[in-house]
UniProtKB/Swiss-Prot annotation:
Keywords, in A-Z order: Carbohydrate metabolism, Cell membrane, Cellulose degradation, Copper, Disulfide bond, Glycoprotein, GPI-anchor, Lipoprotein, Membrane, Metal-binding, Monooxygenase, Oxidoreductase, Polysaccharide degradation, Signal
S-S bridge residues: C71-C197
Organism: Gloeophyllum trabeum (strain ATCC 11539 / FP-39264 / Madison 617)
Cofactor binding, note field: Binds 1 copper ion per subunit.
A biological-process GO annotation: cellulose catabolic process
Protein location: Cell membrane
Protein residues bound to O2: H183, Q192
Stretches for region Disordered: 278-306
UniProt EC number: 1.14.99.56
Keyword Cell membrane in record: yes
Entry function: Lytic polysaccharide monooxygenase (LPMO) that depolymerizes crystalline and amorphous polysaccharides via the oxidation of scissile alpha- or beta-(1-4)-glycosidic bonds, yielding C1 or C4 oxidation products. Catalysis by LPMOs requires the reduction of the active-site copper from Cu(II) to Cu(I) by a reducing agent and H(2)O(2) or O(2) as a cosubstrate. Has broad specificity, cleaving at any position along the beta-glucan backbone of xyloglucan, regardless of substitutions. Shows minor activity on glucomannan.
Protein name: AA9 family lytic polysaccharide monooxygenase A
Length: 321
């Protein structure tokens, strides 16, 4: 005889999985990479190599004091470096495609980058909570009655696009992209953080490294009293939202060192060839649409040879999906 009680835990799990999200695909400099698949990759043999650091699932981080707030994770230990690294030039776009995102999970979309220290390889580097390396390159919150994480991103096919600052010096960087869901953020803890981290080798003629005023650590970049961490989205009189964290950095000259603004979405709509994630993935997996290996610059290739890092093109990642 079927027992309703035995079905309830399964139903609860299904609802939990359906109610959250993560980045399942990223387009960097026009090349498409499969993100880490938390419900598939750990069970593959061999485990697929990715440019994204592993995440435990699609659930949130809620404790701002844990290392998990940095790049996701569970139990406070954070996450481990990925095996691969993508290549991009300063000024290139990065488009993050999210799995289905619930309309109730309103909030900001924020992207940071963190430079890997000299003489350190990104595939073996895990920032500590005291490493002040993270600078914000993009943010969007609430404007004209629209939330970035729901209204705006939904109109962009669940995709958010940012630009690597043109002034940025070459090197290895961790790109930290997150949504902060505010549907339970009236008190702390309550806000839900969904960070995903990707490994990128930046090339180009840029010469600038953000000054200390632009940098934060994770944990540390947000606290329970940081504006925007507690926020009542049901007040009925919202006109603006204070986005947590430092101001956006595009260059040291442009960086003002002031407080973060609740700017309109600074992302751009993804081109139709990449906005439709399913068609992009299919095109990338086909041999006829495989990206050219010439997309990896000479300087990047020589850097990879020196460090032993596996610089990959999109075809490598997509074929391991």
């Amino acid at each position: 005889m079927f027992r309703a009680q035995s079905f309830l835990p399964v139903l609860a799990l299904v609802l939990r999985v359906a109610a959250h999200g993560y980045v399942d695909q990223v387009t960097i400099g026009g090349q498409v990479y499969t993100g880490y698949q938390p419900y598939q990759d750990p069970y593959e043999s061999p485990v697929p190599q990715r440019i994204e650091r592993a995440i435990p699932g699609n659930g949130p981080v809620e404790d701002l004091t844990l290392l998990d707030i940095q790049c996701n994770g569970s139990g406070g230990s954070g996450t481990k470096p990925a095996a691969l690294i993508a290549s991009a030039a300063a000024g290139d776009e990065i488009a993050f495609h999210w799995t289905t995102w619930p309309s109730s999970h309103v909030g900001p979309v924020i992207t940071y980058m963190g430079k890997v220290p000299s003489n350190t390889d990104i595939t073996s580097y895990s920032p500590t909570g005291s490493d002040v390396i993270w600078f914000k390159i993009d943010e969007a919150g609430y404007e004209n009655g629209k939330w970035a994480a729901t209204d705006i991103m939904s109109a962009q096919n669940s995709t958010w696009t940012v630009t690597i600052p043109k002034a940025l010096a070459p090197g290895q960087y961790i790109v930290r992209h997150e949504i902060i869901a505010l549907h339970q953020a009236e008190t702390y803890p309550g806000a839900q953080f969904y960070p995903d981290c990707f490994q990128v080798q930046v090339t180009g003629p840029g010469t600038e490294t953000p000054t200390s005023q632009a940098l934060v650590s994770f944990p540390g970049g947000y606290t329970p009293t940081t504006p925007g961490i507690t926020f009542n989205v049901y007040s009925g009189s919202i006109t603006s939202y204070p986005i947590p964290g430092p101001p956006v950095w595009t260059s040291n000259e442009a960086f003002s060192g002031g407080s973060s603004s609740s700017a309109a979405a600074s992302s751009t709509a993804v081109a139709s060839s990449t906005a439709d994630s399913s068609s992009s993935a299919a095109a990338t997996q086909s041999s006829s649409a495989a990206p050219s290996s010439s997309a990896i610059g000479t300087s990047t290739a020589s850097s990879a040879a020196a460090s032993g890092t596996a610089i990959v093109d999109a075809n490598t990642c997509m074929n391991s999906a």
